[in-house]
């Protein structure tokens, strides 16, 4: 089946059938983003209700193209809901897109891919496109295609840690990292999964704090967090990623005060998750020290960038910017049989506003 006049390509395999070619392409090039590897898709499948529906294409020039894709378990292809990747499994600026043999995908190849997805979207196909492919996708995506935009923050590590420390970190970061050491904060890092339970306890504390900050009912916030981010998810990533996943905990006086999870592949290090006990961490500089240690390790390993991920709040944006980050666009494209994504987003926003208003009425003294 011809999918594009400008660049012709055909589907060769889907799911397990695409795996040998996919593993071959990923093994050839360590610079390929982690989100485009079979190992990351296996993490998603092991820890959530998705199955591998990755597509392998062959272009008329002989090049192979891979679209990492997952299908909600229990749905046939023609009625399926496809994600690339599912919500909660993005990796910041390393957000996915297409893996192309011989270098980055060209606009004509992406056009061919878009044409195919438009013809066969299932009920919905959602594709998140980050740093590697964002510009090419934006140049050819049809105006009628629904798209949302996010922003990731990335720190350039070129020049080594001494350059990053002296020229990119702000004086505030340097001061707080030193203060943490003076106040007895010690960072412990592990890539065996041993610290996952410690991190998870900090994460549950953070969920309670986020509920208060966002004006959400505590029980609802806890339920959503347990559903989307259970401890088993962190454990699965740590186990499957092995040395590519480092859990770091900042300790003070024998108590954990903050933690981060960092993933690595090739030139990239990605800050994937973070959590803290805000009362214990307050005024200690623990978070700055955690990231300083992770960034120093990434520099020592020869990484080129440290991805702080997509910011969720203005407070987090300001914190990450103090490390000297630059902003990277991340686009999310929705291919739908029935155009409902935009309406769902509006309803979701309206529902959050109603909940917040109800909480203000219930607690008038606050």
Language model regions located:
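Active-site/acyl-donor-binding loops of N-acyltransferases
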Residues: 2-8, 71-73, 139-163, 300-366
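A conserved beta-strand-loop-helix scaffold within acyl/acetyltransferase catalytic domains
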Residues: 5-61, 67-81, 132-149, 160-282
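Aromatic (often tryptophan-rich) hydrophobic motifs at membrane interfaces
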Residues: 56, 79, 84, 88, ...
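Acyl/amide activation-and-transfer machinery of modular secondary-metabolite enzymes
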Residues: 88-98, 147-154
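A short, internal acetyl-CoA/4′-phosphopantetheine-binding micro-motif in the GNAT/acyltransferase core
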Residues: 93-105, 274-284
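Non-catalytic accessory segments adjacent to catalytic cores
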Residues: 104-152
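Short catalytic-loop micro-motif centered on adjacent basic/acidic residues
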Residues: 125-127, 188-189, 304-308
């Amino acid at each position: 089946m011809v999918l594009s006049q400008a660049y012709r390509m055909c589907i060769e395999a889907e799911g397990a059938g695409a795996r040998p070619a996919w593993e071959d392409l990923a093994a050839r090039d360590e610079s390929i983003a982690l989100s485009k590897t079979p190992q990351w898709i296996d993490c998603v499948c092991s820890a959530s209700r998705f199955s591998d529906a990755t597509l392998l294409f062959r272009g008329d020039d002989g090049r192979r193209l891979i679209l990492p894709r997952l299908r909600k378990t229990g749905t046939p292809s023609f009625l399926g809901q496809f994600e690339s990747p599912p919500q909660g499994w993005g990796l910041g600026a390393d957000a996915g897109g297409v893996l192309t043999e011989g270098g980055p995908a060209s606009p004509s190849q992406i056009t061919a891919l878009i044409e195919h997805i438009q013809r066969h979207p299932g009920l919905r196909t959602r594709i998140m496109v980050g740093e590697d492919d964002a510009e090419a996708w934006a140049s050819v995506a049809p105006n009628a295609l629904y798209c949302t935009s996010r922003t990731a923050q990335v720190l350039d590590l070129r020049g080594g840690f001494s350059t990053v420390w002296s020229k990119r970190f702000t004086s505030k970061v340097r001061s707080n990292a030193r203060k943490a050491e003076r106040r007895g904060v010690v960072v412990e890092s592990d890539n065996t999964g041993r610290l996952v339970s410690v991190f998870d306890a900090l994460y549950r504390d953070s969920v309670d704090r986020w509920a208060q900050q966002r004006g959400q009912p505590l029980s609802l916030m806890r339920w959503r967090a347990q559903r989307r981010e259970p401890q088993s998810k962190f454990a699965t990533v740590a186990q499957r990623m092995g040395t590519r996943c480092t859990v770091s905990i900042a300790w003070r006086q024998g108590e954990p005060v903050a933690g981060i999870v960092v993933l690595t592949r090739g030139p990239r290090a990605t800050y994937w998750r973070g959590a803290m006990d805000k009362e214990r961490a307050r005024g200690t500089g623990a978070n700055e020290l955690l990231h300083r240690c992770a960034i120093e390790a990434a520099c020592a390993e020869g990484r080129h960038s440290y991805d702080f991920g997509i910011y969720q709040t203005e407070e987090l944006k300001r914190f990450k910017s103090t490390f000297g980050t630059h902003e990277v666009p991340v686009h999310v494209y929705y291919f739908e049989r029935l155009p409902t994504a935009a309406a769902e987003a509006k309803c979701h926003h309206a529902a959050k506003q109603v909940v917040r208003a109800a909480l203000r009425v219930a607690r008038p003294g606050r």
